[in-house]
C-alpha cells in the first residue's frame, strides 16, 4: 500500500501512441494524434469530501494525506504522471459531431492494482484542455457528487461501470446554465477522480476512421485487444473485437434494465469499448415504470435515450463502431453478420435476466410471451419499479381476487391501477411460478439477488447535494454506506415511492448535460 503522491504511475498509452506534446491548451483540431499532453489547472482550496476505501484498496492506495489531496484536486501531479487528454469524436443524439475529446477530463496515467491489473486514473473537472471547445474544463459539485456516488452504487448493484476514488471540492465558483435557458448562476466547483481499466470509447475509433488514419486505427485495435481482450486469437481479430464489444455492450444494457437505470445521453463518445457504464451525466433510475421516461431535458423532444429505447440505441451505436472499423476489415460482411446477430444475443441475455427477476427456475420457451405481457402490464399500470419487484418476492401462492391483488401492491402505485389487467397478469405469473422445479425459497432468493431494494433515486441525490453545498456531509456519508448493500434492508428508510414534491422539481425529475 502506498500514498498516491508516491505511487508509480505507468504511461503506457502516451508511450505507445503519437500525441501533441506542446502543452498548449488552445482549442483546436488535433489530426494525427490520439492525445494532447496537458496539466491540470490548480484550484484555490482543494478539500477532500469523499474517498472510496474500496477503490483505494483495489489500487493499493493508503488513505490520503495532504499531498495526495493536492493531486486529487488537480493542483499537482506526482513525478511519474504524464497527464493527457484523449482525442475522440462521436455521434450525439444521432448526428455526427466531429472531434470532441476530453474537454474536462485529464488522465494521469495507469496505476497497478492489487489484482495486478492496470487502472487508468482520470480527473474530471480539473481544467481546460485542447478539447474543451472554449469551455472552462471545470465541473460543479452537483454533477460531481452524482458521478462519484453513482459510479460506486452501480458497482455494488453488479452493473459494469467505471469507479470513483474521490470527490474534492475546489473552493472555486463555476458559472453554469443548468438548463441552457439563459439563467446562468455560480455553483461550487469540484473534481472527481474516476477509475477504469481504460476510458477508450467508440469515438476513439470514429475519429480515426473519419480522418482515414488506417494505420493508427489498426494500432489502437491491436493495443485494445492485447490489453483487454487477450482471448482474441488468430484471423479476423478486428471482427472478433467487434463481436466481443457487442456482447459486453449487450450485457451492460441488460443490467441497466434490470435495475431500472437510464443513462440519459448514450452518444457514441459515451460508449466504452469495454462495455462499462461511462460518463454519469443526466442519468436516473425510473420511479414509476415508464419505457418512455428520459431524465435528460435535451432529449425530451424525441426521447431518443428513453429507458425502453436503450437497447435499440446501443445497437445503433454499435453500427457506428462497425462503420469506423470497416476500413480495417477486408470482408465487411463479417461485421454486418455480427451486427445482425446482436439482437438475438441481446434478447437471450435480456429474457434470461427477466426470468431471474421473476424467480423462474429456468427460461422456458413460452416464458418470453409471459414476460412480454408482464412488461405490457407494467407500462400500463406504471407502478414504482423498485418497490413492485420487491413486493412480488412475497406474493402469496394464491394471490386472491382482483381487489386482493390491487391491495397487495397498493403501496407502489402512483396513480389508480387497472385492477383487471393487474389481476390477469399476476394470476398468469402465479400459475407459472407454481410449475417451478425449484422450491419457493430458491425462487425468492433468485429474485432477491436480481432486484435491488435500494437505488439512488434522483431526489435522494438532490437532497445530498443541497446539504453538501451548505457544508453538511452527513447524508453523503450515509449514502456511501447504503449503496454498498442495495439488496438488503439496510436503507429501508428509503423504501418508499418518490415523494410528490420531487415529481417536477429541477434536479430530481428534470436534468441536463450541464455539469
Curated annotation (Swiss-Prot):
Originating organism: Cytophaga hutchinsonii (strain ATCC 33406 / DSM 1761 / CIP 103989 / NBRC 15051 / NCIMB 9469 / D465)
Record function comment: Nucleotidyltransferase involved in the post-translational modification of proteins. It can catalyze the addition of adenosine monophosphate (AMP) or uridine monophosphate (UMP) to a protein, resulting in modifications known as AMPylation and UMPylation.
Keyword Magnesium found: yes
Binding site for Mg(2+): 270, 279
Enzyme class at the top of the EC tree: transferase
UniProt name for this protein: Protein nucleotidyltransferase YdiU
Active site: 269
Family named by the database record: Belongs to the SELO family.
Catalyzed reactions: L-seryl-[protein] + ATP = 3-O-(5'-adenylyl)-L-seryl-[protein] + diphosphate; L-threonyl-[protein] + ATP = 3-O-(5'-adenylyl)-L-threonyl-[protein] + diphosphate; L-tyrosyl-[protein] + ATP = O-(5'-adenylyl)-L-tyrosyl-[protein] + diphosphate; L-histidyl-[protein] + UTP = N(tele)-(5'-uridylyl)-L-histidyl-[protein] + diphosphate
